[in-house]
Curated annotation (Swiss-Prot):
<dbReference type="Pfam" id="PF01451">
    <property type="entry name" value="LMWPc"/>
</dbReference>
<dbReference type="GO" id="GO:0005737">
    <property type="term" value="C:cytoplasm"/>
</dbReference>
<protein>
    <recommendedName>
        <fullName>Arsenate reductase 2</fullName>
        <ecNumber>1.20.4.4</ecNumber>
    </recommendedName>
</protein>
<keyword id="KW-0963">Cytoplasm</keyword>
<dbReference type="InterPro" id="IPR036196">
    <property type="entry name" value="Ptyr_pPase_sf"/>
</dbReference>
<feature type="active site" description="Nucleophile">
    <location>
        <position position="10"/>
    </location>
</feature>
<dbReference type="InterPro" id="IPR014064">
    <property type="entry name" value="Arsenate_reductase_ArsC"/>
</dbReference>
<feature type="active site" description="Nucleophile">
    <location>
        <position position="82"/>
    </location>
</feature>
<keyword id="KW-0614">Plasmid</keyword>
<dbReference type="GO" id="GO:0004725">
    <property type="term" value="F:protein tyrosine phosphatase activity"/>
</dbReference>
<dbReference type="InterPro" id="IPR023485">
    <property type="entry name" value="Ptyr_pPase"/>
</dbReference>
<feature type="disulfide bond" description="Redox-active; alternate">
    <location>
        <begin position="82"/>
        <end position="89"/>
    </location>
</feature>
<dbReference type="GO" id="GO:0030612">
    <property type="term" value="F:arsenate reductase (thioredoxin) activity"/>
</dbReference>
<comment type="similarity">
    <text>Belongs to the low molecular weight phosphotyrosine protein phosphatase family. Thioredoxin-coupled ArsC subfamily.</text>
</comment>
<keyword id="KW-0676">Redox-active center</keyword>
<dbReference type="GO" id="GO:0046685">
    <property type="term" value="P:response to arsenic-containing substance"/>
</dbReference>
<feature type="active site" description="Nucleophile">
    <location>
        <position position="89"/>
    </location>
</feature>
């Protein structure tokens, strides 16, 4: 069976989409190719790396990447994680399903905010996997 492809997109591919990619590889990795990208690149937020390390998921080697049209076209599912990405995402081919899972941006906020958003993203991906 061929793996499906899921593509997590947010504004800067810095926090939310990085955490989603980490959770996605952990939870969906057997059945899905998991990628993340941004409309812009802001670098991977060190607090996102630290937050994921706290749940034993290593995203320290992730890079902050712009949306890759080849991956976009080959995706089975594109998930936008913020309203900016939802509104400004490139045109998605008709064969690709798109969903919006909105999460607060923890950048510049308290450590507990990173933990909360990390846990919310993880919970959503677990629910997605279970369905």
């Amino acid at each position: 069976m061929d793996k499906k492809t899921i593509y997590f997109i947010c504004t800067g591919n810095s926090c939310r989409s990085q955490m989603a990619e980490g959770w996605g590889r952990e939870i969906l990795g057997e059945e899905w190719n998991v990628y993340s990208a941004g409309i812009e690149t802001h670098g991977v937020n060190p607090k996102a790396i630290e937050a994921m390390k706290e749940v034993d998921i290593d995203i320290s080697n992730h890079t902050s990447d712009l949306i890759d049209n080849k991956i976009l076209r080959q995706s089975d599912l594109v998930v936008t994680l913020c309203s900016d990405a939802d509104e400004n995402c490139p045109v998605i081919p008709p064969n690709v399903k798109k969903e919006h899972w909105g999460f607060d941006d923890p950048a510049g906020k308290s450590w507990s905010e990173f933990q909360r958003v990390r846990d919310e993203i993880g919970q959503k991906i677990k629910q997605f996997y279970d369905n």
